[in-house]
Amino acid sequence: MMTAAWSDILHEWCARLITRHPGIRWAMTWCPSVASVASGTGTLLLFRRGIEYFPWFVGYLLLLWLSAVVLAHSRRALAARGRRVVGLVVDYTVQTLTHGLLLFLLPIYYASTTLTSRNVSFLVLLAAAALLTTIDPWYRRTIARFQWVELFLFGFGLFASLNVAFPLLRVRSSWGLHLSGFLSVLALTPVFRRPGIPWRNAILRVGVCSISTAILLWPVRDWIPPVPLRLARATLAKDVTDLEPDLPISQISAADLREWGTLACFTAVDAPAGLREPIYHVWRRNGAVVARVALSPIRGGRLGGFRTYSRKLDLGEGPAFWSVDVLTAHDQLIGRVFLTVTP
């Protein structure tokens, strides 16, 4: 009784204060957004150097995130007990953690995205999720109201972070992609468990969803940037000497190309220390694949990227548009190089 009385008095006092000072309502609406931007920017600045330390950051943040997921699952109980303030604190904590992680991931995925390819869609989705968690009114209207949207955002953020962390732990990207999908769903087990449902049933349901997610990621793998791999340098050239391109070009006449008789594609792929990853050069002429060249596996840790190249001798006649895709062993696009052959 005493608690309820104090709660009513506090609610009435807050209502009067907001009525007398309209600016307080505006501050209550937008201050969480400003705080989210500030915390996310601080996280980004703090970890902008030394991506190798990212797994420690992810481990810390995932611990907080999973705690927030468990708390978010108890919101109904908190609301039933009249502890609305506690529920709001839980919501804000989850929103802030989500925003901080997504904002930190954005530049990492941007560096690995080829803007002229389909994997830019994943970057757009990541940016949209970060924007939704930044603007508090949007978050309340589009995410907090619908639990399935909130769950998707949790799972998406977990997947995006684990997809970066596994290669840094020297896990091949082909394995890391599926492990990320599996664990990102498995981590939501506390949310899938409803009152009256045994843990065994919840784990079984989540296990099926986790395995399904890992399998479904295979056909859409080329829509996902191969983080943290990125193309540090890339060019087509007359030749490569001592792992440096000779006469790099982006355009050449058909006569000059005929005189050269060969083209070389030089690429330098930046990768974290300790990672070994097979890569391929896929040559295309006017959109048609004319060669797929397996290269030496890249070894991460070199400043400026691991350098490698491939050559093409049969160049055809006349004007053409050449492109070379740099792919991982399971066809994720690291980058793309173009060359225009003029008449």
Identify the residue ranges that each predicted region occupies:
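Membrane-anchoring hydrophobic segments
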Residues: M1-I135
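Solvent-exposed serine/threonine-rich low-complexity stretches and specific carbohydrate-binding patches
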Residues: A291-G301
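Aromatic sugar-binding surface patches on proteins
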Residues: G300-K312
